[in-house]
Design a protein with these regions (language model features):
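N-terminal anchoring/stem segment of glycosyltransferases
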Residues: 1-69, 76-85
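Active-site flanking residues adjacent to catalytic metal/cofactor-binding acidic residues
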Residues: 92-94
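Short aromatic/hydrophobic "clamp" motif used to bind/position activated sugar donors
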Residues: 89
């Protein structure tokens, strides 16, 4: 079983910086096999034919949520398609923080996911 962490930082330098900070925090936990930061540049280049060509104009015309968060289900689904059964995916918004002293709590949640399949939360750990 592999554990993946993803976030998105794009649209404005503040969000790119927040995404970089968050992926750094995720790597420091030493829990995840793969930590992925999606950016607007990645959507425009690596996902041009599957996402950007269709939604780019809307995103650029609607600044709030970088296109009303249209990218969020896309990046989650994109990564989920690559997972094997039993793998775990954790997504956090770039404005979140991962506190190192919460590592054990995150591992506890991952054990819960093994039996319950999914956890959703509107607040951080």
């Amino acid at each position: 079983m592999k554990k993946y962490f993803i976030t998105f930082g794009g649209g404005h330098q503040n969000f790119i910086d927040a995404g970089n900070r968050l992926t750094h925090q995720a790597k420091q936990l030493d829990i995840f096999d793969n930590v992925i930061l999606f950016t607007d540049e990645i959507l425009k280049t690596e996902h041009a034919d599957t996402f950007w060509d269709k939604h780019g104009k809307f995103i650029e015309e609607n600044k709030r949520g970088y296109g009303y968060w249209l990218w969020k289900p896309y990046i989650i689904q994109h990564v989920m398609k690559t997972l094997d059964d039993g793998d775990i995916l954790m997504y956090l918004d770039a404005g979140c923080e991962i506190l190192q002293h919460k590592r054990e709590k995150i591992l506890e949640y991952m054990k819960y996911v093994e039996s319950e399949q999914i956890i959703g939360s509107k607040t951080a750990v």
